[in-house]
Amino acid sequence: MILNQRKEIALSLLDTFKDAGNVALELRKKGLKKEIKSDNTPVTNGDIEVNHILTKKISTLTPEIPIISEETSSNKKNENLNNFWLIDPIDGTSSYINNKDEFTINAALIINKKPVLGVINAPDKKRLFYSYAPSNSFEIVNNQEINLINQKKKNINLITAVSYSNELKPDILKLHKEFKVNKYQKMKSSLKFCVIAAGEFDLYIAEPRAYEWDI
């Protein structure tokens, strides 16, 4: 898949991600319906509806490429697939349920087992990010594209984002010391990767334990 094709797909998804974000916020406002999945993690009608919106659009854009989603896949690894979409309709479901502002809506296109395109929407923060190549990563601000490759952190302090569960674990603190981290901030969801891309943070440190849609 050539660069222009990836760009066209990414741009075609932006309005869908905005719509999905609005739906997620509206469903939360009305009151979410919650269940506990077999892996003991929560899922809401917001997760299901956002998943439906994304998979419907993506299936239209690339009907030949299979989709792996947190809300429709088993916990088995999909090691035999070379080309596929990864969807995490709502990353940070606990934040979403508890009216916190860190949940995100996510999709990535994997070609030859490597990510080549991604879109992330943080609806509460009104931040929308997308990328279709290493030097083509953007945030939409006031309907204008900001190329994140040009964004630099304004201070020299090394700042890291950590997940809530890893905050004070000895191996994480050891890495902080090794990298001479000046400050860290607890953060949920894929928002961690977005703020690094935007030049606001430097590192994300976590234990190597994740499903496909968490990476």
Where do the model's predicted regions map?
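Residues that form or immediately flank small-molecule/cofactor binding pockets and catalytic motifs
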Residues: 29, 39, 72, 142, ...
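DPxDG-like acidic metal-binding loop motif
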Residues: 79-138
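An extended, acidic
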Residues: 150-215
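Generic detector of well-ordered alpha-helical packing
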Residues: 48, 71, 89-92, 123, ...
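Short secondary-structure junctions
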Residues: 32-35, 137-139, 179-185
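Residue-level signal for inorganic ion chemistry
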Residues: 24, 47, 58, 93, ...
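N-terminal subdomain of lithium-sensitive/metallo-dependent phosphomonoesterases centered on the IMPase/IPPase/PAP
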Residues: 1-90, 174
